[in-house]
Structure formats: C-alpha cells, structure tokens
A protein has these predicted regions:
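Asp-based, Mg2+/Mn2+-dependent phosphohydrolase catalytic module
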Residues: 139-191
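Active-site neighborhood of HAD-like aspartate-dependent phosphohydrolases
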Residues: 1-52
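Short, acidic loop-to-helix structural element flanking the phosphoryl-transfer center
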Residues: 61-89, 95-101
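Conserved acidic residues
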Residues: 1, 113, 132
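A short, structured active-site edge motif that brings together acidic residues
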Residues: 90-94, 106-124
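Anion (oxyanion) recognition and catalysis
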Residues: 81, 106, 146
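Conserved Lys-Pro-Asp/Glu-containing loop-to-beta segment of HAD-superfamily phosphomonoesterases
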Residues: 122-145
Length: 191
C-alpha cells in the first residue's frame, strides 16, 4: 500500500526550536499552543507579513536543519516499510531546500521510498500517484486532500482541529498512526 507523509510538523518536530527562535527574535515567550493557534506565525502572534518573512529568512534553515524528528516517527515508518508500505514524502518545501531536507532525512535515518518537492495541491499529487492515505497537518492541505477523496490522518494542532470529515482522523502518535494504517491495509485486502 502506498502512503504519503508531510515533513514539517509531521516527520520533523519544529515546535521546540520554533519556540526558542521566536523568543530570541521577538524578545517574548510564546507557548507552543499560542504559536500553533493558526497555521501562519503572523496570525498566531500578530506580527506583520514582513516581520514573518524576516523571521523565516533568519531562522528557517536552522529550524529545518536542527529540529528533531517526531517521537517514534522513524520506528513507525520503518515498521510500515517492513510490512509492505511504499512511503512517499510529499512536501511544499521548494527545491532550494532539497539539500538541507535530504541531509536531515539521512542524518535521522528516516525511511522512505520517494520524495516530491514544491507540491501546492497535495490531493491532486496523491491521486496522480495513486496514494489512498496521507499524513498531514496543514488545514488547507487537509481540505485539498479530502476534496480529492484522499483519506487523511491529521497530526492534531490547534490550527486543524476544527476539521471534520468521514475520511479524516486526528492521531497524535506515530505508533497509533502505524497501527491504524496497518488496519486499513488489511481492510483494503479484504475489500
């Protein structure tokens, strides 16, 4: 079975480093819950678009390089691959982040079969690649996936908890995600 997985806030846990860099840059502590109230940083802490751009220009690469993987992510993906899953990373990250991203994935031994960069419409990408499931966090991507009929596992963050659909489930633990996908794979074989 083919599955798709996002990187930021799904494989890569940017929360701790993001919190520290926001404090360093803006001189004020914001909780992770506050930072993730909205998908865009500027909407969560009420800064201008220009301030947000400057923040990401200064710290974006560092956050992408130095953040740790989500707990149990590597083990869960390895287990899924051992059980016949084909793992495709689908990310909105531009190609100019390819070197950093590839290096981070290798450093943390994240198992996957294919990676696709610069994807704006993840639902369409999943349909084109015949991928029935995707693990995602961004609400706009989740909506696009659901519109295309792609079953979606959402890593729960305040910015996506309002979404509800028969093809959507919120799961916060990679071990539970792996278990759920294995159950779905067995269901697909029986159908």
């Amino acid at each position: 079975m083919r599955i798709a997985v996002d990187i930021d806030n799904v494989i890569l846990d940017m929360g701790p480093l993001l919190t520290a860099k926001v404090r360093d840059h803006f001189g004020k502590y914001y909780s992770l819950r506050t930072l993730y109230q909205h998908y865009r940083l500027r909407d969560s802490i009420e800064i201008s678009r220009l301030e947000e751009i400057r923040f990401w220009q200064k710290y974006g690469y560092e956050i992408a390089q130095e953040s740790e993987p989500k707990q149990f992510c590597r083990q869960a993906l390895l287990w899924l691959k051992k059980h016949g899953f084909f793992v495709v990373i689908i990310t909105a990250r531009p190609l100019l982040m390819k070197l950093i991203t590839d290096s981070w994935l290798k450093k943390h031994q994240i198992p996957f079969d294919q990676i696709v960069y610069g994807v704006k419409k993840k639902g369409e990408e999943c349909i084109q690649k015949r991928i029935p499931f995707m693990v995602e966090d961004a609400a706009h991507n989740i909506i696009n996936l659901l519109e295309q009929g792609v079953r979606t596992i959402a890593f729960p963050y305040p910015y996506n908890l309002y979404l509800r659909d028969d093809k959507l489930i919120h799961i916060a633990d990679w071990r539970e995600i792996a278990f759920f996908l294995m159950k779905m794979k067995k269901g697909f074989k029986e159908a």
